[in-house]
Amino acid sequence: MKTTNHSSNLTLIVAVSENDVIGKDNDLIWHLKNDLKRFKALTSGHCIIMGRKTFESFPKPLPNRTHIVITRQQNYKAPEGVIIVNSLEAAIKKAEQDTNPFIIGGGEIYKQALNVVDIIEFTRVHHSFEGDTFFPVISETIWKETDRIFHKKDDLHKFDFSYITYKRR
């Protein structure tokens, strides 16, 4: 059930292993060049909403995107142009001028966002990994798969992976 009203296509974007791992020690575990290109192509020019730890995992803010960072820390210092809020609801409100804002992590933010997003852009990495951050199971009663593209591993991609788009039923 959706719990927040918004007029845009609020999209969650995530890469998930076969055993639902999304990260370890606040970092990505795998490097899939085409998945990173897809992330850039989809999110470029849009608001990206993330938790503080996800933001701090970047060497610097990502170009051509409006960063909205959720943190409980009072007086959190961020680079100029980065918007700081204290809740997912406040982040969505700050992104309301964007027709397609993205939720980009991390684990706690994803759990909250599943209740409010319209679309999930999901990369399934066809391999199991050890990790400490997991993505919840996607319920088929709430989400409908609308697109799937399989990519075989190759010289640039150590693992098979699939792009899957889910839309809220």
Predicted features and spans:
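Enzymes that bind and transform nitrogen-containing heteroaromatic metabolites
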Residues: 2-169
